[in-house]
Amino acid sequence: AADKLNMSQSAMSHALKRLRTLLNEDILIRTSREMEVTPYARQISDRVRQILTEIESTLLSKAIFEPATAQETFRIAASDYVEATIGINLVQQFAIQAPGIRIRITNLDKETVMATLDENRIDLIINARLPLKSWHVEQNLYREEFVCVFKSDDALTELSMEDYLRRSHLLVSMRDDFQGAGDEILERQQQSRQVIWSTPHFMAVPFLLANSDCVALLPRRMAQQCAKAMDLKLLSPPMTIEGFTVSMIWHQRNTNRPQHQWLRAQVIEATQN
């Protein structure tokens, strides 16, 4: 605990004693192995976090941010799908408005990304369907839908269920299986598709499609961009498949920071172009 706070063990001990006197409660107790958080500390942690965040946000809101001269690095957790669809516009916007700004895209691991945000190791998450705490802020960006993607010289002009099931499928999945969008619908109809390739990388799929007779369900925004660049064809699925909402998530401590407000405005603009 002392190392995380950049304090000596002696200073940490004195700080804990002062807190114990002030609160009339322990917040850390020593066990046989390590220091352990007490039930009281867990009980007040959310409220204390909110108060500290409000103080930090209030103080930082007075800062001035000039994009044209700023030298800053923003860290965004996002999938390669988001990077490919939004990043194209963001690169152009930053080059014109803020040439000194740098963006670091990090892997989006759903198991750890929220903790990374809380620890201030990233500034923003752009994704869909993540569990939030009370100190997280979410803003919807756009609604996405799925389309079926083939190589352009495929003879199909309309996709029937028979054609859909007959084809070999490529799947984008972050899970260790071959199940994805629409498979629950097929199971209810006692049907299944043949998934021959599962990958966590959205941007690998268009290259695979361009050199095979397979089909893949991809988000429309990404598919439209890849279709132009790689000569692919888009068709509607033969069944209704629920889409998803892409949103950005940040810690509330950054809500009033001018540079963070500017970043979020740029992301919104990038999704609208």
Question: PLM features: what roles do these ranges have?
Answer:
Residues 128, 156-159, 167-190, 220, ...:
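Secondary-structure junction motif
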Residues 85-86, 156-161, 233-273:
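A late-sequence structural motif
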Residues 133-139, 144, 203-252:
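Beta-alpha-beta core module
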Residues 70-132, 198-199:
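Central regulatory/effector-binding core of bacterial HTH transcription factors
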Residues 133-169, 260:
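Flexible hinge/capping segments at coil-to-helix
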Residues 22-23, 44-66:
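Alpha-helical linker/hinge and terminal dimerization helices associated
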Residues 20-39:
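A short LG(V/I)-centered, amphipathic sequence patch enriched
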Residues 33, 39, 64-83, 97-101, ...:
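Interdomain hinge and pocket-entrance segments immediately C-terminal to HTH DNA-binding domains
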